């Protein structure tokens, strides 16, 4: 396993990551909620990649694992942007996005931003939010109104 490095974002955030050089589309593992690149799934992916000579990128979202910051400051869009920054900086060519649990949701958000770079998507017990797709426009409006009322707006 390669050692942890840190990528600096323009706002000063430091994102911990490990990158293994190799061939083929880079495997990019996106951990789940409150998980990190030291977890068993991430380790299994990087070990397989190393054994096959495949490129692999692991990362810890800001506020998780080895990345500094407050977990409470994390959002899906913030973490999506962190993943996109690391892919842009360290992955040449196509990527295979592998998302575990909440990482599956991030996998889809990242794929929407860089569709021409995505060779494949692999969801491991992926937990994307599909609630908007399961409701009519009227039901979504009712839910939004109830949400606004609940938070006092």
Model-predicted segments: where are they?
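Catalytic nucleophile-loop/oxyanion-hole region of alpha/beta-hydrolase
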Residues: 65-90
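Short beta-strand element of the alpha/beta-hydrolase
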Residues: 24-32
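Conserved alpha/beta-hydrolase
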Residues: 46-68
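Short beta-strand immediately N-terminal to the catalytic nucleophile in serine-hydrolase-like folds
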Residues: 97-99, 124
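Gly/Ala-rich beta-loop-alpha elbow adjacent to hydrolase catalytic centers
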Residues: 99-107
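N-terminal cap/lid segment of alpha/beta-hydrolase-fold proteins
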Residues: 1-21
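The alpha/beta-hydrolase serine catalytic core
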Residues: 117-153
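The serine-hydrolase catalytic nucleophile loop
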Residues: 33-46
């Amino acid at each position: 396993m390669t050692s942890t490095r840190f990528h600096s974002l323009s706002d000063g955030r430091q994102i911990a990551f490990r990158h293994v050089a190799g061939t083929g589309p880079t495997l990019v593992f996106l951990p789940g909620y409150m998980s990190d690149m030291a977890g068993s799934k991430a380790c299994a992916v990087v070990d397989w990649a190393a054994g096959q000579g495949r490129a692999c990128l692991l990362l810890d979202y800001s506020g998780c694992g080895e990345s500094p910051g407050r977990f409470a400051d994390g959002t899906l869009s913030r973490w999506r942007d962190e993943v996109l920054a690391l892919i842009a900086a360290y992955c040449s060519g196509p990527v295979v996005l592998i998302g575990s649990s909440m990482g599956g949701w991030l996998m889809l958000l990242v794929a929407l931003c860089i569709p021409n770079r995505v060779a494949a998507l692999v969801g491991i017990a992926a937990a994307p939010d599909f609630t908007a797709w399961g409701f009519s426009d009227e039901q979504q409006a009712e839910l939004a109104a109830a949400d606004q009322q609940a938070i006092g707006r």
